[in-house]
């Protein structure tokens, strides 16, 4: 048999196996819906981490019998579990959510076409009937509009997979009396935008917010002759390009923004990392009470005493209560350079006995502690086998 023919036969067999895999995944998803309905009826938690661990261990053991690496099985089924949890969360949210009948007003760093604008619409689409937008010029203005009852929700970016934490937002969280009530992750695809299609060497000036420049630094370094101009947001950069009407100007911005402002996309996906994701938080005047059935994040900020080992004592309390820490960030305190403020995300419902017990202990060993909010986790923490 010619080599080409045998290759086609093998590929055809793989295609048939892939079709079976997709069909089985669809069957699995149908069962997930039934499981979710049963959990809702019986008031059971969506996620059972102990069961997930046992299931994964059994699958790894089975995989070894078929000469499949444990890492491969782990990554594959963590993705399947994540999809399963997300499906159940959506169904429970639909069952519990009465907000779909009302509109909501969102403040964000504008103008239209900014990533904050995209995040506001994505969150509103999942939770409300309609999104009414309120464009702001600074993060502080975004928060003030909600504090002053001019808007219902503040949308703020808090961290990015390329450029890390957004310190300005952490500073605001220390001062505001608003609460985090939700989060949403947005895939960030920075594009090089111009008035019309031109050669890269014709560009003289490039506009954008400082974050995209940081996230696309590898690309920007290739053009040291370009003059960099910082703007209040990516949408503000696109707006300026349109207003100035100069073909030698360019901007880093979103594809949606390019359509809003009538700009051409010269190059796509310019970030240093492929998976460039920004996590946004939603703030409201009132804290949110979350069903114990839903995977939840509780966020705190605190300062410890200056004695050695203060932070490790806090972390030991979390470990003692078997609470999963999703994120820990530290910041120097202005005017007190020897002290630090810690921001921590914990995978737990604030109302749980474990968290309340942990809080009582943490309060005794910290100089300052503030609960920023308790809210549904958009992305679940992967389990370890």
From Swiss-Prot:
GO molecular-function terms, A-Z: chorismate mutase activity; prephenate dehydratase activity
GO biological process: chorismate metabolic process; L-phenylalanine biosynthetic process
Chorismate mutase domain ranges (all copies): 1-92
Main location: cytoplasm
Domain Prephenate dehydratase, first and last residues per copy: 105-285
Residues holding substrate: 11, 28, 39, 48, 52, 84, 88
EC number: 5.4.99.5, 4.2.1.51
Keyword Phosphoprotein carried by entry: no
Pathway: Amino-acid biosynthesis; L-phenylalanine biosynthesis; phenylpyruvate from prephenate: step 1/1; Metabolic intermediate biosynthesis; prephenate biosynthesis; prephenate from chorismate: step 1/1
Feature type site, description Essential for prephenate dehydratase activity: 278
Domain (ACT) ranges: 299-376
Subcellular location as annotated: Cytoplasm
InterPro entries found in the cross-reference section: ACT-like_dom_sf, ACT_dom, Chor_mutase/pphenate_deHydtase, Chorismate_II_sf, CM_dom_sf, CM_II_prokaryot, CM_P_1, Preph_deHydtase
UniProt keyword Cell membrane, yes or no: no
Pfam families membership: CM_2, PDT
Chain intervals for the UniProt region annotation (Regulatory): 286-385
Free-text comment about domains: The regulatory domain shows changes in the ESRP sequence, which is involved in the allosteric binding of phenylalanine. These changes suggest the desensitization of the enzyme to inhibition by phenylalanine and would permit the overproduction of phenylalanine.
The protein's role, per its UniProt record: Catalyzes the Claisen rearrangement of chorismate to prephenate and the decarboxylation/dehydration of prephenate to phenylpyruvate.
Protein name: Bifunctional chorismate mutase/prephenate dehydratase
Species for this entry: Buchnera aphidicola subsp. Acyrthosiphon pisum (strain APS) (Acyrthosiphon pisum symbiotic bacterium)
């Amino acid at each position: 048999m010619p080599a080409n023919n045998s290759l086609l036969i093998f590929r055809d067999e793989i295609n048939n196996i892939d079709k079976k895999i997709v069909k089985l995944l669809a069957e699995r998803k149908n069962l997930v819906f039934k499981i979710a309905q049963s959990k809702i009826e019986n008031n059971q938690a969506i996620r059972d981490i102990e069961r997930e661990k046992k299931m994964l261990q059994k699958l790894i053991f089975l995989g070894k019998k078929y000469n499949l690496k444990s890492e491969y099985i782990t990554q594959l089924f963590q993705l399947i579990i994540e999809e399963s949890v997300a499906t159940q969360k959506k169904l429970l949210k639909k069952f519990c959510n009465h907000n779909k009948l009302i509109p909501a007003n969102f403040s964000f760093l504008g103008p239209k076409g900014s990533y904050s604008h995209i995040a506001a619409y994505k969150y509103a689409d999942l939770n409300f009937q309609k999104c009414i937008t309120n464009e702001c010029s600074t993060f502080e203005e975004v928060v003030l509009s909600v504090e002053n009852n001019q808007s219902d929700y503040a949308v703020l970016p808090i961290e990015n997979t390329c450029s890390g934490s957004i310190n300005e937002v952490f500073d605001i969280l220390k001062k505001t009396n608003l609460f985090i009530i939700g989060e949403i992750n947005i895939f960030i695809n920075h594009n090089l935008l111009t008035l019309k299609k031109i050669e890269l060497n014709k560009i003289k000036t490039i506009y954008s917010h400082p974050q995209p420049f940081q996230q696309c630094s590898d690309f920007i370094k290739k053009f040291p002759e370009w003059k960099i101009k910082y703007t209040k947001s990516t949408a503000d950069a696109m707006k300026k390009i349109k207003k100035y009407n100069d073909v030698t100007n360019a901007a880093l911005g979103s594809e949606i923004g390019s359509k809003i402002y009538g700009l051409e996309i010269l190059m796509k996906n310019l970030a240093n990392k492929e998976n460039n994701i920004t996590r946004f938080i939603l703030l409201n005047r009132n804290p949110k009470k979350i069903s114990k059935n839903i995977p939840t994040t509780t966020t705190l900020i605190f300062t410890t005493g200056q004695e050695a080992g203060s932070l490790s004592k806090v972390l030991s309390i979390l470990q003692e209560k078997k609470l999963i820490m999703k994120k820990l960030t530290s910041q120097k305190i202005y005017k007190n350079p020897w002290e630090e403020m810690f921001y921590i995300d914990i995978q737990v419902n604030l109302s749980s006995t474990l968290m309340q017990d942990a809080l009582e202990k943490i309060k005794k060993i910290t100089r300052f502690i503030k609960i920023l909010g308790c809210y549904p986790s958009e992305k679940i923490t992967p389990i370890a086998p």
